[in-house]
UniProtKB/Swiss-Prot annotation:
Species per Swiss-Prot/TrEMBL record: Bradyrhizobium diazoefficiens (strain JCM 10833 / BCRC 13528 / IAM 13628 / NBRC 14792 / USDA 110)
SUPFAM superfamilies, per database record: MOP-like, P-loop containing nucleoside triphosphate hydrolases
GO biological process assignments: carbohydrate transport; glycerol-3-phosphate transmembrane transport; glycerophosphodiester transmembrane transport
UniProt similarity note: Belongs to the ABC transporter superfamily. sn-glycerol-3-phosphate importer (TC 3.A.1.1.3) family.
UniProt EC number: 7.6.2.10
Domain of life: Bacteria
Name of the protein in question: sn-glycerol-3-phosphate import ATP-binding protein UgpC
Pfam families cross-referenced by the UniProt entry: ABC_tran (PF00005)
The keyword Cell membrane appears for this protein: yes
Residues of the ABC transporter domain: 4-235
Keywords linked to the UniProt accession: ATP-binding, Cell inner membrane, Cell membrane, Membrane, Nucleotide-binding, Sugar transport, Translocase, Transport
Length: 361
């Protein structure tokens, strides 16, 4: 096991495109760190730099107290699991898991011990003689993880390993990966674009955007106190409602310095349908445009009567003038109904006009 430290890490490609812009991240020994962000944000590039598959233009990557910038991937004592299982189709499960160890010249008795132990942990013992074509997608992914486990590395690297699986299997494998990491207690860095996957897996969450780190911290802390409007709209499904504080409707309710903040954010679950306006809070009249019933809860999509200026759109952000409200159960107003929703002061999130700074509500 080992800690991983990224110090002002940069990656610039030929032509001057800067994919990674001075990233600083500390992953403690035994932690599960998740890099999350939209496509093109640089998360997979950063992971490949840790693995040694991409060169480092600037800064340092430290694994277990050793700067590895100039060290070959095979000598970094890491193991990587990819989106593509990359199993040898003509080999059995056992031989797929043993292949890397044999290439390193390990004794066959030690290989057998490691493969059988990994198979036991991953519940693959009964499948060791099967070929990959005889396995389901989830079983193939477990074999790929087993191939990484038998190396007993200091660090596991996961590059969107669940992307090829269907929704039900993704959930099951997500749970299995977390249980496995806790059992092995091996430092792990995991890349995903799925914020739900990120929230449920991570000890420490790194939210990336445009080659930079937007926020680092405990997943729940990031959800409850996003540092920027990008984080607010990316982390959480449905996304946070964001609106200008400078519209007369909101400005008059916030009052004081809060009214000059620039951007107001409210999570869908923090609204209630009510005729009352809470002291210090915000109430909005809406026209119901759509209803989504998903079982235990219902999403109400409404349009505001007066549209306002908004911050620049970010991935997952709601269209201008639209507000989404999450309510428990299946009871909901009818489409076309006029309703009033409100949120109390402690549930309000305020940001600067450019969306880059969180302010006190």
């Amino acid at each position: 096991m080992a800690n991983v430290t990224l110090r002002n890490v940069r990656k610039t490609y030929t032509g001057g495109f800067e994919a990674i812009k001075g990233v600083n991240v500390d992953v403690a020994d035994g932690q599960f760190c998740v890099l999350v962000g939209p496509s093109g944000c640089g998360k997979s590039t950063l992971l490949r730099m840790v693995a040694g598959l991409e060169t480092v233009t600037g800064g340092e990557i430290d694994i277990g107290g050793r700067v590895v910038n100039q060290i070959e991937p095979a000598d970094r004592d890491i193991a990587m699991v990819f989106q593509n299982y990359a199993l040898y189709p003509h080999m059995s499960v056992y031989n797929n898991m043993a292949y890397g160890l044999r290439n390193r010249g390990m004794a066959e008795a030690e290989i057998k011990t490691r493969v059988e132990e990994a198979a036991r942990v991953l519940e693959l013992t009964s499948m060791l003689e099967r070929k990959p074509r005889q396995l389901s997608g989830g079983q193939r992914q477990r074999v790929a993880m087993g191939r990484a486990i038998v190396r007993q590395p200091k660090v596991f690297l996961f590059d969107e390993p669940l992307s090829n699986l269907d929704a039900k299997l993704r959930i099951a494998m997500r749970v299995e990966i977390r249980k496995l990491q806790r059992r092995l207690n091996t430092t792990s860095i995991y890349v995903t674009h799925d914020q739900l996957e990120a929230m449920t897996l991570a000890d420490v969450l790194v939210v990336m955007n445009g080659g930079q780190v937007e926020q680092v911290g405990n997943p729940l802390a990031i959800y409850e106190k996003p540092a920027t409007t990008f984080v607010a709209s990316f982390i959480g499904a449905p996304p946070m409602n964001l609106m200008s504080t400078r519209s007369d409707e909101i400005k008059s309710q916030l009052g004081g310095s809060a009214a000059e903040a620039g951007v107001l954010g409210i999570r869908p679950e923090d609204f209630v349908i009510t005729d009352q306006t809470p002291a210090g809070g915000v109430a909005l009249p809406l026209t119901v445009e759509a209803i989504e019933r998903v079982g235990a809860e219902t999403f109400v999509y409404g349009s505001r009567e007066q549209e306002d200026q908004r911050v620049a759109a970010t991935p997952g952000e709601l269209p201008p003038g639209e507000v989404i409200v999450r309510i428990p159960g299946t009871e909901a107003p009818t489409i076309g109904a006029r309703i009033r929703v409100a949120a109390i002061r402690p549930k309000l999130h305020l940001f600067s006009g450019d969306g880059r700074t969180r302010l006190e509500a």
